[in-house]
Amino acid sequence: LKKVERKYEEVIETYGDMYEAEICKERQLPDYNDGMRIVQRRLFWVFLSMSREKRIHLQKSASIIGDTLKLHSHGDATAYGSLVAEVNAVASLLKGKGNWGSKTSSVACRAAAMRYTECAMRPSAEDYFRYAQHSDMVTGEIGYPEPAFIPVPFPYALMNGFFGITKSGKCQIPSYNIHDLYERLLFLLGQKPEKIIKPYFGMTLKMDGEFQNLLTQGIGKVE
């Protein structure tokens, strides 16, 4: 092997940037295909791998997390934290039973331990994931098969929004009304006239025309 001498700063910068780019792509930011972070996709896939009769009935959260860890080996706290976030999402596809915490009270209330809570898929999730069986499967990091992405009508992040900070910037995706997203989808399929949809959370708009340019051309300014 040839010895290569490099400055410590160069090594940190080069490999640090490579690591950050990989983390952003694989874990921190939603995938553009289905709008899900990898832990979200793995959680939903655990439900979708069950029979319909089982997934629409309440399951112990500890059991769900146990199955998720077969795909997502980054600790039960991370997986359960994501499950709590999905149950409490604005347009949640999961329903919960037990203490799932509260963000509305003046005092922060954390969710109960996973052994005390239960959750199941909402009926609306059956429609959203209707094409899940057509997912392209890949071998996950532990060796189990998992979907590269799940075919969905529109990216999940557009329903519930997303905010994340990375080493070199931040990602902020506003939330849209589900009905408006389906209206936009029908327009893109040529089934309905164009309707400019507006986010209802996560963004402040200066002018309607400015947002129309942002939506149709990708050019505009938001706060």
Where are these regions (language model features)?
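Catalytic phosphate-handling regions of large nucleic-acid enzymes and associated NTPases
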Residues: 1-216
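Charged, surface-exposed alpha-helical interface/stalk elements
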Residues: 218-223
